[in-house]
């Protein structure tokens, strides 16, 4: 374990001082011994304290650590960020630029991870898609740059495409939710990602496509590889009960933009599946006839594809990573080959990764949700009725890991809806659900929790394991319409090599690489670190 005086960075007990002394303390994730951080944490903590003392012009800054809020950084704040970076990098003798020699600091992935969620995103693995030096400085800058106009436009276009594919669910329980306690609201929010994933799977099997599809994987820091089905269950890391930093493993997650069947036959409508309780296999056999293609969507203000070599290479590796993550969750081994494994093993793999992801996000996966929260989820998301029925009436859910876990739990985990008045929900439940919900108002065989619903989500992955295509696509959009498509053959060996290189950077085993000199005029003008970047000013000085 780290010494008491140097525990501050990993524990992230952050005191935020803005607007005349506003202070907030955050609970800390556990630490599983990070000896490589011991010499550097005091320096880094001093840097954090200095940075968080600078004033802000925006009086609506949320009561959260500055480094994780997305408010616009004015020039004065940018100067403060850069000034403190100079101090952190011990650059006084190099002024006005950052030191040429990389200081001994916590590795970039630790510095960049959110305090309550010790994990990284897929995009953080794309360290040099723009400039790796910028990625490096961003990790330690303790504040994110304000999104550009292009980024805001891209977010809006992605949201529009998502809503076009997946009809936004209507909240029919607003009046009921007005009486929710803060705990009940937190429970409902913690289920959002899980409910979206279920919805995406059902839409994939009913309309042949899904957008914003959650994926997750675990990186072995020693081998620089992703963990596959053959090694996953051996890791103590996946059996933790709370967020932690780990010497050996890093959790990575992201959202795949678009998953689409290349040969789709109009199958069952989502509503009919709800009414008739069709099985997942029925949906698959009815609608999905061809391979499922992983697609990444890039949005543009004008119908022009970038010519930047680094950006294009980054796009190709990004779509490869999404394909890799989804393949691993569906039973492929790290070489990208379908392993001779059983449906149960695929269930267990997906279940383990999803539970670990929820834990690293700080969620209590075993906390039974309030019964009223469960019914609100059903009213707003009627397509989960089949899953709720299984949790209610079945002794076994068909996932050996979950069934074994539940058998070892005490009766404190029971869940009872018999005390809830069903009439309170009759006005907001769809007619097709009214009769089926009657059996839910009793004592359930299993509690409704993130863990139990995840055990049922894992059943979707064997359905797609043999249907993932080796072809991937990048689709470029402007104003909601695709104007160009690039096709790439999935190359798992190349992705493994890419992963090895990027993980070395993220864990501090190699220094960042600057961009090509020829790219400096095009890229450095958009970087908030240009004024203190020695490399940029050496070849293109700021005047």
UniProtKB/Swiss-Prot annotation:
<keyword id="KW-0460">Magnesium</keyword>
<keyword id="KW-0540">Nuclease</keyword>
<keyword id="KW-0496">Mitochondrion</keyword>
<comment type="subunit">
    <text>Monomer.</text>
</comment>
<keyword id="KW-0411">Iron-sulfur</keyword>
<dbReference type="InterPro" id="IPR019190">
    <property type="entry name" value="EXOV"/>
</dbReference>
<dbReference type="GO" id="GO:0051539">
    <property type="term" value="F:4 iron, 4 sulfur cluster binding"/>
</dbReference>
<dbReference type="GO" id="GO:0005739">
    <property type="term" value="C:mitochondrion"/>
</dbReference>
<feature type="binding site">
    <location>
        <position position="527"/>
    </location>
    <ligand>
        <name>[4Fe-4S] cluster</name>
    </ligand>
</feature>
<dbReference type="Pfam" id="PF09810">
    <property type="entry name" value="Exo5"/>
</dbReference>
<feature type="transit peptide" description="Mitochondrion">
    <location>
        <begin position="1"/>
        <end position="26"/>
    </location>
</feature>
<comment type="function">
    <text>Single strand DNA specific 5'exonuclease involved in mitochondrial DNA replication and recombination. Releases dinucleotides as main products of catalysis. Has the capacity to slide across 5'double-stranded DNA or 5'RNA sequences and resumes cutting two nucleotides downstream of the double-stranded-to-single-stranded junction or RNA-to-DNA junction, respectively.</text>
</comment>
<dbReference type="GO" id="GO:0036297">
    <property type="term" value="P:interstrand cross-link repair"/>
</dbReference>
<keyword id="KW-0378">Hydrolase</keyword>
<feature type="binding site">
    <location>
        <position position="533"/>
    </location>
    <ligand>
        <name>[4Fe-4S] cluster</name>
    </ligand>
</feature>
<dbReference type="GO" id="GO:0045145">
    <property type="term" value="F:single-stranded DNA 5'-3' DNA exonuclease activity"/>
</dbReference>
<dbReference type="GO" id="GO:0046872">
    <property type="term" value="F:metal ion binding"/>
</dbReference>
<keyword id="KW-0004">4Fe-4S</keyword>
<keyword id="KW-0408">Iron</keyword>
<keyword id="KW-0809">Transit peptide</keyword>
<dbReference type="GO" id="GO:0005634">
    <property type="term" value="C:nucleus"/>
</dbReference>
<keyword id="KW-0238">DNA-binding</keyword>
<protein>
    <recommendedName>
        <fullName>Exonuclease V, mitochondrial</fullName>
        <ecNumber>3.1.-.-</ecNumber>
    </recommendedName>
</protein>
<comment type="similarity">
    <text>Belongs to the EXO5 family.</text>
</comment>
<keyword id="KW-0269">Exonuclease</keyword>
<dbReference type="GO" id="GO:0003677">
    <property type="term" value="F:DNA binding"/>
</dbReference>
<feature type="binding site">
    <location>
        <position position="524"/>
    </location>
    <ligand>
        <name>[4Fe-4S] cluster</name>
    </ligand>
</feature>
<feature type="binding site">
    <location>
        <position position="131"/>
    </location>
    <ligand>
        <name>[4Fe-4S] cluster</name>
    </ligand>
</feature>
<keyword id="KW-0479">Metal-binding</keyword>
